[in-house]
Amino acid sequence: MGLPWYRVHTVVLNDPGRLIAVHLMHTALVAGWAGSMALYEIAVFDPSDPVLNPMWRQGMFVLPFMVRLGITNSWGGWTINGENVTDPGFWSFEGVAAAHIGLSGLLFLAAIWHWVYWDLELFRDPRTGEPALDLPKMFGIHLFLSGLLCFGFGAFHLTGLFGPGMWVSDAYSITGRVQPVAPAWGPEGFNPFNPGGVVSHHIAAGIVGILAGLFHLSVRPPQRLYKALRMGNIETVLSSSISAVFFAAFIVAGTMWYGSAATPVELFGPTRYQWDQEYFHQEMERRVQKDVAAGASLSEAWNRIPAKLAFYDYIGNNPAKGGLFRAGPMNKGDGIAESWLGHATFKDKEGRELTVRRMPTFFETFPVVLIDKDGVLRADIPFRRAESKYSIEQMGVTVSFYGGKLDGQTFTDAPTVKKYARKAQLGEAFEFDRETLKSDGVFRSSARGWFTFGHASFALIFFFGHLWHGGRTLFRDVFAGIGEEVTEQVEFGAFQKVGDKTTRKQEAG
């Protein structure tokens, strides 16, 4: 046929059997990739420390999606929470992976069958014997089935009626676990961070889909609408399908990047806005102040802070810090976190408590500046020591640690104080193992960043694909060089005498 590479799909344009075959093969590839990728991730995943070495630090991509849907156990005897399990059941990580690979094989065989047996009676109009597809009817069937699936997922899987539920956590992502979720039918259901909204929206959207599907199965489209939207053209189906996909891709890119109940921090890592707004830092300060007010010492108060919460307040876990072209997981950047050193508090020689100005997201380097409670500069690490006025040495700055590995220790020598000031600029201080993975010290992004970038990019490409195929189907006659006038002249039944405009038939009024 001699088609260029970008036009090869023309061969299935008027061949429903082989169109089904290529879609089956595509689904087989997707399911096979998902299962294979899951097995690979399970093989390289280290479940030993879910607090300081969680899945999102290790670059896991499909694992978080499995966990949020209720899969937490492995046939290897471990769980996502770092515990041991004796009976993981079939629906473990490996079980789901095997099911996908098995499904992939069946779809592969189905694709081959449909490619060989392409000319089925099903694709022919029983009245004329000509190849024909009833696209509005097919639309109704697909809408009904997808509505049924959507409703079933919300009403059974998520509610725990017949399924595990979904991943639910507190506002600071400390106590996350899989549990059944009740639907939220009030205004609170529109809060993107409320898991109940996910349930109610699936149930509601499913009901709408079922009703809409039944409507389209029982009501034929008006002739004018059918013609205006080119409902008889398979490229219309392609165009509208692409629009549904790019719209969904834009939505999930947003919910992933800005955060939502469906993209929990424990599974995908923090968002950049939680660093920008000092979300976790403020919560730690609130907890400490509350404990101190209740009579606890600073050391006791900071020791009650979970290491998990402290680790979220570290810039290396900010997905916007990793460049898009820096390959590898976060652990390949700053290393594998081993321990929290504690909360660093700085003081100058006059006894003023100082805090290090935190590095903004989009800076690779930033001056180390120590300010007092009023925001006044009191000390820094100067660029040019000869002209310095506020150096650590000149201001007699010391650092004390509360909580963590260095709890109760105070350092007064300038080089050590500077070291911890540089660490404090990046949030809470942690000790990292950079040897095991040969980590290079350059920050990487989490799965949150990769997912967002990928889906936003493909959504944009698919948007243009929608315009392209929509334009082709709407203006097919123009692109083919056949004007409306010519079409009318040769169309059977438009005139009493073919091509004679003076014999136009009157439409039935």
UniProtKB/Swiss-Prot annotation:
<feature type="transmembrane region" description="Helical">
    <location>
        <begin position="21"/>
        <end position="36"/>
    </location>
</feature>
<keyword id="KW-0157">Chromophore</keyword>
<keyword id="KW-1133">Transmembrane helix</keyword>
<dbReference type="GO" id="GO:0009772">
    <property type="term" value="P:photosynthetic electron transport in photosystem II"/>
</dbReference>
<protein>
    <recommendedName>
        <fullName>Photosystem II CP47 reaction center protein</fullName>
    </recommendedName>
</protein>
<dbReference type="InterPro" id="IPR017486">
    <property type="entry name" value="PSII_PsbB"/>
</dbReference>
<feature type="transmembrane region" description="Helical">
    <location>
        <begin position="203"/>
        <end position="218"/>
    </location>
</feature>
<dbReference type="Pfam" id="PF00421">
    <property type="entry name" value="PSII"/>
</dbReference>
<keyword id="KW-0793">Thylakoid</keyword>
<dbReference type="GO" id="GO:0045156">
    <property type="term" value="F:electron transporter, transferring electrons within the cyclic electron transport pathway of photosynthesis activity"/>
</dbReference>
<keyword id="KW-0472">Membrane</keyword>
<dbReference type="InterPro" id="IPR000932">
    <property type="entry name" value="PS_antenna-like"/>
</dbReference>
<feature type="transmembrane region" description="Helical">
    <location>
        <begin position="237"/>
        <end position="252"/>
    </location>
</feature>
<dbReference type="GO" id="GO:0009523">
    <property type="term" value="C:photosystem II"/>
</dbReference>
<keyword id="KW-0148">Chlorophyll</keyword>
<keyword id="KW-0812">Transmembrane</keyword>
<feature type="transmembrane region" description="Helical">
    <location>
        <begin position="101"/>
        <end position="115"/>
    </location>
</feature>
<feature type="transmembrane region" description="Helical">
    <location>
        <begin position="457"/>
        <end position="472"/>
    </location>
</feature>
<keyword id="KW-0602">Photosynthesis</keyword>
<dbReference type="GO" id="GO:0016168">
    <property type="term" value="F:chlorophyll binding"/>
</dbReference>
<dbReference type="InterPro" id="IPR036001">
    <property type="entry name" value="PS_II_antenna-like_sf"/>
</dbReference>
<keyword id="KW-0934">Plastid</keyword>
<keyword id="KW-0194">Cyanelle</keyword>
<feature type="transmembrane region" description="Helical">
    <location>
        <begin position="140"/>
        <end position="156"/>
    </location>
</feature>
<comment type="function">
    <text>One of the components of the core complex of photosystem II (PSII). It binds chlorophyll and helps catalyze the primary light-induced photochemical processes of PSII. PSII is a light-driven water:plastoquinone oxidoreductase, using light energy to abstract electrons from H(2)O, generating O(2) and a proton gradient subsequently used for ATP formation.</text>
</comment>
<dbReference type="GO" id="GO:0033115">
    <property type="term" value="C:cyanelle thylakoid membrane"/>
</dbReference>
<comment type="similarity">
    <text>Belongs to the PsbB/PsbC family. PsbB subfamily.</text>
</comment>
<keyword id="KW-0604">Photosystem II</keyword>
<comment type="subunit">
    <text>PSII is composed of 1 copy each of membrane proteins PsbA, PsbB, PsbC, PsbD, PsbE, PsbF, PsbH, PsbI, PsbJ, PsbK, PsbL, PsbM, PsbT, PsbX, PsbY, PsbZ, Psb30/Ycf12, at least 3 peripheral proteins of the oxygen-evolving complex and a large number of cofactors. It forms dimeric complexes.</text>
</comment>
